[in-house]
């Protein structure tokens, strides 16, 4: 989860999120090089007094400052397109979970196990000392580690957005439409997200809590009432 004054991404917990962070680092490296070069050129121009009143054009320099940015954009575009297609990649899922957005809570259905429940934010007066304000819920979504999960996401009223940054998932929940997303969680723990689409007065009070655990604990959770 995100912490106070954090400048980087939250902990990665899926292959697609790892690729997103790698692409971010790749892009930042290129941007940093461009920034340093630009500052150097501006400083160099301001510090010297060399002028040429007879120079009307510079064919070579025009070719250079056209080709180099084009090559730079290619180095950014290729991994970006690769990542874009990876986010829409589908694979054979082992477990399907249906996610339904409401004003202002989430409903989860384990279609393979005939289990469903609603998930509400824990009000501040009922919070424990180790709870996180505006993030903890009364019923957490639980999934097993290293398992292909398919999320079927929709809404019962207005447009919501089911988002868990650590998994690299952000999918709109649209009434009358069933969107899908896939993920594999590689680390156990409790991960948080929030609705990322303004959906009314209590938009800020419909968090998402996802617990990633072992298959044994997941089966115990499914069998619990």
From Swiss-Prot:
SUPFAM superfamilies: Cupredoxins, Cytochrome c oxidase subunit II-like, transmembrane region. Mg(2+) binds at residue 197. Cu cation A2 binds at residues 195, 197, 199, 203. It is an enzyme of class 7 (translocase). Its EC number is 7.1.1.9. One of its GO terms (cellular component) is mitochondrial inner membrane. Coiled coil: none annotated. InterPro entries: CcO_II (IPR045187), CcO_II-like_C (IPR002429), CcO_II_C (IPR034210), Copper_CuA (IPR001505), Cupredoxin (IPR008972), Cyt_c_oxidase_su2 (IPR014222), Cyt_c_oxidase_su2_TM_dom (IPR011759), Cyt_c_oxidase_su2_TM_sf (IPR036257). It is found in: Mitochondrion inner membrane. Cu cation A1 binds at residues 160, 195, 199, 206. Its main location: mitochondrion. The keyword Glycoprotein does not apply. It comes from the Eukaryota. PANTHER family: CYTOCHROME C OXIDASE SUBUNIT 2, CYTOCHROME C OXIDASE, SUBUNIT II. This is Cytochrome c oxidase subunit 2.
């Amino acid at each position: 989860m995100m912490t106070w004054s954090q400048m980087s991404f939250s902990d990665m917990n899926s292959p697609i999120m790892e690729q997103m962070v790698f692409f971010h680092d790749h892009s930042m490296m290129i941007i940093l090089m461009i920034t340093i070069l630009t500052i150097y050129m501006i400083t160099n121009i301001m510090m010297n007094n060399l002028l040429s009143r007879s120079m009307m054009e510079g064919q070579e320099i025009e070719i250079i400052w056209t080709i180099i940015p084009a090559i730079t954009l290619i180095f950014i575009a290729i991994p970006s397109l690769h990542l874009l297609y990876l986010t829409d990649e589908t694979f054979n899922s082992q477990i399907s979970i249906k996610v339904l957005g409401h004003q202002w809570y989430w409903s989860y259905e384990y279609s393979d196990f005939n289990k469903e429940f609603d998930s509400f934010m824990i009000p501040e007066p009922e919070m424990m000392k180790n709870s996180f304000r505006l993030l903890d819920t009364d019923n957490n979504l639980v999934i097993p580690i290293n398992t292909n999960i398919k999320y079927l996401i929709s809404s019962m009223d207005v447009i919501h957005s089911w988002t868990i940054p650590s998994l690299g998932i952000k999918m709109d929940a649209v009434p009358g439409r069933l969107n899908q997303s896939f993920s594999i969680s590689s680390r156990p723990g409790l991960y948080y997200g929030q609705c990322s689409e303004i959906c009314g007065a209590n938009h800020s009070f419909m968090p998402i809590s996802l617990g990633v655990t072992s298959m044994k604990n997941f089966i115990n959770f499914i069998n619990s009432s």
